[in-house]
Amino acid sequence: MLSRKGIIPEEYVLTRLAEDPTEPRYRARERRARFVSKKGNCNVAHKNIREQGRFLQDVFTTLVDLKWPHTLLIFTMSFLCSWLLFAMVWWLIAFAHGDLAPGEGTTVPCVTSIHSFSSAFLFSIEVQVTIGFGGRMVTEECPLAILILIVQNIVGLMINAIMLGCIFMKTSQAHRRAETLIFSKHAVIALRHGRLCFMLRVGDLRKSMIISATIHMQVVRKTTSPEGEVVPLHQVDIPMENGVGGNSIFLVAPLIIYHVIDANSPLYDLGPSDLHHHQDLEIIVILEGVVETTGITTQARTSYLADEILWGHRFVPIVAEEDGRYSVDYSKFGNTIKVPTPLCTAHQLDEDHSLLDALTLASTRGPLRKRSVPVAKAKPRFSISPDSLS
């Protein structure tokens, strides 16, 4: 409407206003929701849980799983409620004994220097926190006051023990150690020993080792059974291998973990075109081991979607020997280079080995035959002008 009146030029009219409502509208395919995020968090929302009381049966685990603000709020309210509760008890004891009556009393009070609820509240804090100012004290006049003193001390010790244990468990949780276990941002598929392999790189930034480290991998995809049952998250275990074979790894330096795509692999019919079309595929990698310093089992997780798998790439070397020891350049941790790789599935490669022979023949031509050019006649491929240096 504004463009018709000449207020907004015609070329600045929004596309949404200019499109024909009778024409069908197309939109890009939405990206598949992750089952496990890149940082290892499970992308699952639990809804309509009826038996909420099950969480209260394990109060300690519930407190540890809560976020820090909620945990601190619960402990703060626990201290305040216990102080107020016992302050009311001390005030009632003083009121029943007549210690709150005005005037100089000839009888010995149950608790000295308690004249109001405020003084009873201060005495409750002094008893539970064991401050010991010395202005108020329990006398031998009331046995009930002695019993309440013992009960409040026990309650205070229990709250302190639970709070310290919860804080210790939250600060020493296993996932804190997993923050320094890193995975490559992309996974690659390339030839290794004449077979197509799915490869990724894993590393540990700390010097303290992960003992008995093992790595597992699962493929998660949406499948339909022959009976018509739709399984939205069908999980299939696939074997992972390293340089020494098996799932156990010695994670001192970054390692390239690979999976040989053979006839038993769920990636046997996966080709480069499937990756480009964002196939409904997610590969979850789980690294698990025991922390050397604490003895706690830790687990690091990540996942790779179809568009995060690079076909025909290989990781660059990052470990070098310098001054009698090995050094790791983490700036190249996720860097890859293109390598000759058949543009077919592992199934097609097993059926037609000529694809691999043709690829090997093509890769041996050209780069190995290097023309020798005399140094004196060699021409520079580029030159640096004085303007470029300024």
UniProtKB/Swiss-Prot annotation:
Membrane topology designation? Multi-pass membrane protein
Task: List residues in topological domain: Cytoplasmic.
Answer: 1-65, 172-390
Q: Which of the residues bear the PTM Phosphoserine?
A: 385
**Residue numbers marked as site, Role in the control of polyamine-mediated channel gating and in the blocking by intracellular magnesium:** 160
| Superkingdom of origin organism | Eukaryota
Q: Which reaction does it catalyse?
A: K(+)(in) = K(+)(out)
Q: Where do the annotations place K(+) 1 binding?
A: 130
Q: Which residues bind K(+) 2?
A: 133
User: Any known activators or inhibitors?
Assistant: KATP channels are regulated by cytoplasmic ATP/ADP ratios; ATP inhibits the channel by closing the pore, while ADP activates the channel. Activated by phosphatidylinositol 4,5-biphosphate (PtdIns(4,5)P2).
Q: Which InterPro entries does the annotation name?
A: Ig_E-set, IRK_C, K_chnl_inward-rec_Kir, K_chnl_inward-rec_Kir6.2, K_chnl_inward-rec_Kir_cyto, Kir_TM
ATP-binding as UniProt keyword: yes
Give ranges inserted in the membrane but not transmembrane: 117-133
| Phosphothreonine modification, residue list | 341
Main localization is membrane
List, in alphabetical order, the Gene Ontology terms for molecular function in this entry: ankyrin binding; ATP binding; ATP-activated inward rectifier potassium channel activity; metal ion binding; transmembrane transporter binding; voltage-gated monoatomic ion channel activity involved in regulation of presynaptic membrane potential
SUPFAM superfamilies in UniProt: E set domains, Voltage-gated potassium channels
Family statement drawn from the similarity comment of this UniProt entry: Belongs to the inward rectifier-type potassium channel (TC 1.A.2.1) family. KCNJ11 subfamily.
* Quaternary structure and interacting proteins, as annotated: Homotetramer; the homotetramer binds four ATP molecules (one ATP per subunit). Forms an heterooctamer with ABCC8/SUR1; one KCNJ11 homotetramer interacts with four ABCC8/SUR1 molecules. Interacts with ABCC9/SUR2.
Give the protein name, as stated in the record: ATP-sensitive inward rectifier potassium channel 11
Record the organism.
Cavia porcellus (Guinea pig)
